[in-house]
Swiss-Prot record:
Disulfide bonds: none annotated. Component of the PI(3,5)P2 regulatory complex. The gene is ATG18. The PI(3,5)P2 regulatory complex regulates both the synthesis and turnover of phosphatidylinositol 3,5-bisphosphate (PtdIns(3,5)P2). Necessary for proper vacuole morphology. Plays an important role in osmotically-induced vacuole fragmentation. Required for cytoplasm to vacuole transport (Cvt) vesicle formation, pexophagy and starvation-induced autophagy. Involved in correct ATG9 trafficking to the pre-autophagosomal structure. Might also be involved in premeiotic DNA replication. It comes from Debaryomyces hansenii (strain ATCC 36239 / CBS 767 / BCRC 21394 / JCM 1990 / NBRC 0083 / IGC 2968). Keywords: Autophagy, Endosome, Membrane, Protein transport, Repeat, Transport, Vacuole, WD repeat. Residues 349-386 have a biased composition (Acidic residues). The N-terminus might form a beta-propeller domain involved in specific binding to phosphatidylinositol 3,5-bisphosphate (PIP2), leading to the association of the protein to the membrane. The L/FRRG motif is essential for the cytoplasm to vacuole transport (Cvt) pathway, for the recruitment of ATG8 and ATG16 to the PAS in nutrient-rich medium, and for its recruitment to and dissociation from the PAS under starvation conditions. GO terms for cellular component: cytosol; endosome membrane; fungal-type vacuole membrane; PAS complex; phagophore; phagophore assembly site membrane. This is Autophagy-related protein 18. Signal peptide: none annotated.
């Protein structure tokens, strides 16, 4: 193992001139495109303590907890398309892109980095789309098969035949987490058909288990021919557990919480994020990420299951809070819909996602109030299909569940509101357009709160969506840069320039230069750290105020390809 090295590039986003910064980043980005170390794959390990990069000429591994630094690098004349770590052990799994002689996207190598030796090689019938590791299981995902191995012996335990899964969607929870043996695998379900009042999942063959033919699986689905459902599979018993009805359109991202109790999903529209209970299949939360369709790259839970993060092609990372207040808001909406359906059975709730919607990319935060109709498939359910999270999780501050509060709370006319509870405002992201959008949303939210019981669901759900608790904008140069993000549980004290946060009511345009002359200009804040890695080869650390939410603050930036 190589010794930790000092960071080659360390940029404090709060202290730099923005124009010089953009010029510097632009020049670096141009050199990246022509470099041999272009990034093919990025991932965190299971406890988010390390980052692994698959490069054109090998791979790199970095520590990111407690301190950032490179801990291992292996250069070879092979493009690495997939890399997966097993926590912080010396065991990794890699898959080549197949661009060189002897390399193949169908070949998996298990490598001991400490001894620099190959433990074993496995050849599969088609391209490997995903590799997932836990302490007891290794999952190999092909387009139409899933292979389950015992990590300790590398013995094949089970094979699952699936419908085509070209996007390589699957997620694996940790095993034996907090004494719970919730080792679950989640992957897209084939379309369903209704036969004799019972739902059957077509095309699922489980080879090597007790059921070698089509399985009857417990399902919460009540609609045929859906393509946005998720199968939950127990990797310990090697049996399917349930099918969760997530979306009517195709899935874009899915993830299980570390303890295997929660499932988060997003469709290819990228406007709605949903969270389900794995045990019951019931929808616990529904959040609106934005209005216009976009590509969601990844979803991730915090390790305490209090937050869900979504990265997307818009270059924005949205943070959704899983709290009692958010759960109650979802439940109240469903309760109103249920009452209206009982009074008028022919009442039509919001229609499903329209495939012909305007395919306009998000602006800064996708916050124009317009309905995309993604939440109709759950509005017909009864009130009991939404569970309320116990209040013991945490006490939530008033009006913190909607991200649009984060920008116009500073301009609120409510004199009784404590400034310390107002969401943070990032002046570097402030613009007239954003202020106008946020102000219009505030009016809509207040109108919905007053008139929600009288308006049809189609309109009240438009005016009163549950939006993100916080967000951040990645300082990327190019568009559609892929990114992954994870949030740490530990609250840390960071020093942030006051000019970075102070609102300027008379001058809403973003400041061009934020500088720190003395220590008096720094404001101590207790923040949760959010780590973001992009395909440009950058690692960012942002700070999230867990009480106020709003805009996350760029704390550090590192370049990974030096």
């Amino acid at each position: 193992m190589l010794k930790n090295q000092s960071n080659s590039v360390h940029v404090d986003g709060s202290h730099n001139n923005s124009s010089n910064y953009n010029d510097e980043v632009s020049s670096i980005a141009k050199s990246i495109r022509n470099a041999d170390e272009s990034v093919n794959f990025i991932t965190f390990n299971q406890d988010a303590s390390c980052i692994a990069l698959g490069l054109k000429n090998g791979y790199k591994i970095f520590n990111c907890k407690p301190n950032f630094g490179k801990c291992y690098q292996f250069k070879k004349n092979e493009s690495i398309g997939k890399i997966e770590m097993l926590y912080c052990t010396s065991l990794i799994a890699i898959v080549g892109l197949g661009e060189e002689v002897g390399s193949s996207p169908r070949k998996l190598k298990i490598i001991n980095t400490r001894r620099q030796s190959t433990i074993c090689e496995l050849i599969f019938p088609s391209t490997i789309l995903q590799v997932k590791l836990s302490k007891s299981r290794m999952i190999i995902l092909l387009e139409e098969q899933i292979y389950i191995y015992d990590v300790t012996t590398m013995k094949l335990l089970h094979t699952i035949e699936t419908s085509p899964n070209g996007n390589g969607l699957c997620t694996l929870s940790a095993d034996n987490c907090d004494g719970k043996n919730n080792s679950y695998l989640a992957y897209p379900s084939p379309p369903k058909t209704i036969t004799h009042d019972s739902l059957l999942v077509n095309g699922i063959n489980t080879n090597g288990g007790m059921n070698s033919i089509q399985n009857n699986i417990q399902s919460v689905s009540n609609s045929p021919n859906r393509i946005g459902d998720v199968i939950i599979f127990n990797t310990t018993t090697l049996q399917p557990l349930s099918v969760i009805e997530a979306h009517k359109s195709a899935l874009a991202a899915i993830t299980l919480s570390t303890d295997g109790t929660l499932l988060a999903t997003a469709s290819d529209k990228g406007t709605i994020v949903r969270v389900f209970s794995v045990a019951t299949g019931l929808k616990l939360y529904q959040f609106r990420r934005g209005t216009y369709p976009t590509k969601i790259f990844t979803l991730s839970f915090s390790f305490d299951n209090k937050y869900v993060l979504a990265t997307s092609s818009s270059g924005t990372v949205h943070i959704f809070r899983l709290g009692e207040e958010e759960s109650l808001e979802n439940k109240h909406k469903r309760k109103r819909n249920s009452k209206k359906l009982k009074l008028n059975p022919e009442y039509e709730t919001i229609t499903e996602e329209n495939e012909n919607e305007i395919q306009k990319d998000d602006a800064e935060d996708d916050d124009i109030i317009q309905d995309d109709g993604d939440d109709s498939d759950a509005d017909d359910d009864d009130d009991e299909s939404l569970e309320v999270i116990p209040s013991k999780h945490r006490k939530l501050s008033q009006d913190s569940n909607n991200s649009f509060t984060s920008f116009n709370s500073a301009f609120s006319n409510d004199d009784n509101k404590d400034n310390k509870s107002e969401p943070l405002i990032d002046q570097t992201r402030l613009s007239v357009a954003r202020l106008i959008r946020r102000s219009s949303q505030t009016l809509g939210r207040k109108a919905a709160q007053k008139m929600g019981d009288f308006l049809p669901t189609r309109f009240s759900s438009i005016l009163e969506p549950t939006r993100n608790f916080a967000s951040l904008k990645i300082n990327s140069v190019s568009k559609d840069i892929k990114s992954i993000a994870i949030i740490n549980n530990e609250v840390q004290e960071d020093l942030v320039p006051q000019a970075y946060l102070n609102a300027k009511e008379n001058n809403p345009s973003p400041p061009k230069d934020i500088s720190v002359n003395t220590a008096k200009d720094l404001l101590p804040l207790n923040l949760l750290h959010i780590n973001v890695v992009t395909s440009e080869g950058y690692f960012y650390t942002y700070g999230l105020d867990p009480d106020r939410g709003g805009d996350c603050i760029l704390l550090h930036q590192y370049f990974l390809l030096d």
